[in-house]
Each structure stands twice: as structure tokens, then as C-alpha cells.
């Protein structure tokens, strides 16, 4: 890795500072706005560099088309958007898309330039974990303060942010003690956050990581993988047992899951499905009603990517989103000759795909995951295979 004080580390640092607004400084402050302008300018520049200078993995074909679609609809929203409820920001849609997706290009470019390497992650991962932990407790305090009565247990959305950290842990594949300790740390907060979707994805990631770590490990090291896996299972079982005894809300969440209750999501989904199938306009059926139109229907988002897109961008939008995942899958499979990159891309694919089914995925990718994704994609394209070894 090149010197610590480089453009890539500055870029990541600025994003970290931006996302800590509300914890380290006032949310929506002048500082946050200035930082956002700077990092978005850097991101747009790097997106152009990536497309004009480098031969990109097929993943970027899907990302380019998806991003262009969102840019088109977001621009139309800013120019029109009279269907939005009063007080809804017209620029917020486009801003969230750019924040979520553009950093992938920057991480890719910086990796190709040698500014991001495994040493970068060894520097940033501890910092990221500290920042996300601060965000978790800060969010916990805010949400609990808004509760009435004696109940002080909530679901904490920052659990999904801990999920987004897990793929980066593949960097420590040669140091399994560190890798599995950090994995266990993330699992603890994911369980504590009580977000059922986050827990499901985390379990899938854990199984995927352990199985593939065992597969690619030398035979004399496989016993250590089994040992660490067993220790994680024992530790998590202890945490779950403690929560079952001490947390009434945790028991309620389990009962709701077993009973098939979805916190009202089934009702919300039904509203959008019914609206789509009662659509009489061919143009709206094919091209949607416009960005954030779900707010005009139910005064809230669909909380499911495919429903959100089919209402906003129509059947064509869903086809574009599907092609994005197909190209993502193809890129992931092409990395099979590089085991660690294959595992890393696989974990990110699992996160993105499952979040698209029961959450808002494309608009909520964290800088931690997009940096990791861009890095793996950049390393995949390196001509010197020796640099692909983690």
C-alpha cells in the first residue's frame, strides 16, 4: 500500500465523518453539507475515470445502467414531483442513490491505482467497528428516549450496518483468531439489534464464510476453522440463551417470527401489489409512476426493492434491476479462481440480494461495504495474480 496520507484514505475518512453526523456533530450542519459536496465531486470524477480508463468487470455494466435509471428518474423528480406529500425533499431521492452507489467506483479506481490494499483495511476496519458501535448506542439512546412507559427494548437498524462490515473481515483470512473474534463481535450487535432480516443475513454469511474458509484452507489448518466455528456457535448460543431469559421483547420477536407476523409489512406490500395490478396506464405499467411514488400511495416506502422499483420505474425498472443482479452473479462466479475474492464478493451478493427482498438495499449501501466491494472488483482485474493473494 502507498503512504497512509493519500487520496483514498482522505476519501474514506470524509465519508466516515459525514456518516457520523448526529453523533460527532450536529446532523445536517454546514460541515456535513460541505463534506457531502466534496465526496460527491470526487465520486463522480472517479466514476468517469473508471468507465473511461479501465476495462471493467461485467458487474459495472449492470451498475452503470441501474445508476443511469435512478439518475433519470431522480432528475424528473426534482423538476416535477408534485405528487409527493408536503415537506418531502425532492432532492433526497437522488442524493441517497449517489451516496449509496457512487463510492463503489471510487474504491475500484483507488484499488487499481494501488491506493487501497489489504493494509488499508487493517487500518480502517478497527475504526469502522468503533464508529458503527458508537452509532449503534447513539441510535439506541435516541429511540429509547422516544418510548413511553417502562419498555426500553427496541429494534435497532444499525444492526444492518454491522452486517455490512462482515465481508471486509475476509481480509483477516490468514489470522482466523482476529477474523472470528470480529465476526462474533458483529454477531453480538446484530442479535442485540433484533432486526430479523439482519439476523437472517448474518447467519447466512456466517455459514458461507465458515464453509468456504474450510474449503480453501490448507488441510493442516482446517482443524482451526472447525474449532473457531464451534467456539462461535457456543458463544452465540450463550448470548441467545441469556437474551431469552432476560429480554421479554426478544421472546416477542421470536414468537412473531414463528407466527409469520411481519410487523405490518404484509399489509403494506398488499397495498402496492394491488395498486400495480390495478394500473390501467400502459406507460405507468412499463415505466412506473416516478421516483418515490410509493410515498404518494401509502405515505411511506415499500421497504422492498422490487415493489419500490415496480411502482416507481415499472416493469422496465425491475428488468434493469434483475440484469444488475445477473451481472453481479456472473462477476462473482468469475472470481472462483481467486478464493478469497470469491468469498468476499459472495458475501456482498448475499447481502444485496436478500436485502432487496425484505428491506431497502440499493439506497442503503454503507461506505464500509461499497469500499470492500470496489476493492474486490479492483483486485479481480489486477493483471499480476500475486497481488490477488490476501
Predicted regions, residues:
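Transmembrane signal-anchor hairpin modules in multi-pass inner-membrane enzymes, especially those
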Residues: 1-76, 115, 171-177, 381-390
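Aromatic-anchored transmembrane helix interface
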Residues: 33-41, 57-78, 84-109, 127-129, ...
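Hydrophobic transmembrane alpha-helices and their immediate junctions
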Residues: 59-60, 313-353, 371-380, 384
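Alpha-helical transmembrane segments of multi-pass inner-membrane proteins
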Residues: 109, 113-143, 153-212
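Long extracytoplasmic/lumenal interhelical loops at the membrane interface
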Residues: 259-313
Amino acid at each position: 500500500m502507498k503512504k497512509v496520507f493519500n487520496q483514498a484514505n482522505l476519501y474514506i475518512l470524509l465519508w466516515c465523518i459525514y456518516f457520523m453526523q448526529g453523533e460527532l456533530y450536529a446532523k445536517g450542519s454546514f460541515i456535513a453539507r460541505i463534506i457531502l459536496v466534496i465526496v460527491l465531486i470526487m465520486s463522480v470524477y472517479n466514476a468517469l475515470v473508471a468507465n473511461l480508463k479501465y476495462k471493467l468487470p461485467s458487474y459495472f455494466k449492470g451498475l452503470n445502467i441501474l445508476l443511469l435509471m435512478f439518475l433519470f428518474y431522480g432528475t424528473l423528480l426534482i423538476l416535477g414531483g408534485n405528487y409527493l406529500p408536503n415537506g418531502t425533499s425532492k432532492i433526497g431521492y437522488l442524493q441517497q442513490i449517489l451516496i449509496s452507489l457512487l463510492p463503489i467506483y471510487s474504491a475500484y479506481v483507488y484499488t487499481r491505482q494501488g491506493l487501497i490494499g489489504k493494509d488499508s483495511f487493517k487500518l480502517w476496519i478497527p475504526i469502522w467497528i468503533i464508529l458503527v458501535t458508537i452509532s449503534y448506542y447513539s441510535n439506541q439512546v435516541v429511540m429509547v428516549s422516544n418510548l413511553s412507559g417502562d419498555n426500553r427494548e427496541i429494534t435497532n437498524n444499525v444492526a444492518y450496518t454491522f452486517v455490512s462490515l462482515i465481508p471486509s473481515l475476509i481480509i483477516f483470512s490468514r489470522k482466523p483468531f482476529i477474523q472470528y473474534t470480529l465476526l462474533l463481535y458483529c454477531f453480538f450487535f446484530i442479535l442485540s439489534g433484533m432486526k430479523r432480516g439482519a439476523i437472517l443475513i448474518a447467519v447466512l454469511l456466517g455459514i458461507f464464510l465458515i464453509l468456504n474458509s474450510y474449503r480453501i484452507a490448507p488441510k493442516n489448518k482446517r482443524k482451526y476453522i472447525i474449532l473457531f466455528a464451534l467456539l462461535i456457535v457456543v458463544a452465540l448460543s450463550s448470548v441467545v440463551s441469556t437474551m431469552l431469559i432476560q429480554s421479554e421483547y426478544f421472546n416477542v420477536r421470536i414468537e412473531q417470527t414463528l407466527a409469520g407476523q411481519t410487523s405490518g409489512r404484509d399489509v403494506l406490500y398488499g397495498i402496492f401489489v394491488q395498486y400495480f395490478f390495478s394500473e390501467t396506464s400502459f406507460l405507468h405499467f412499463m415505466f412506473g409512476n416516478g421516483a418515490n411514488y410509493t410515498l404518494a400511495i401509502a405515505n411511506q416506502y415499500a421497504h422492498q426493492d422490487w415493489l419500490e422499483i415496480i411502482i416507481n420505474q415499472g416493469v422496465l425498472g425491475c428488468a434493469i434491476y434483475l440484469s444488475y443482479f445477473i451481472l453481479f452473479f456472473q462477476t462473482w462466479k468469475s472470481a472462483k479462481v481467486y478464493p478469497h475474492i470469491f468469498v468476499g464478493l459472495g458475501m456482498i451478493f448475499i447481502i444485496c440480494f436478500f436485502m432487496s427482498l425484505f428491506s431497502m438495499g440499493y439506497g442503503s449501501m454503507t461506505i464500509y461495504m461499497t469500499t470492500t466491494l470496489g476493492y474486490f472488483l479492483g483486485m479481480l482485474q489486477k493483471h499480476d495474480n500475486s497481488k490477488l493473494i490476501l
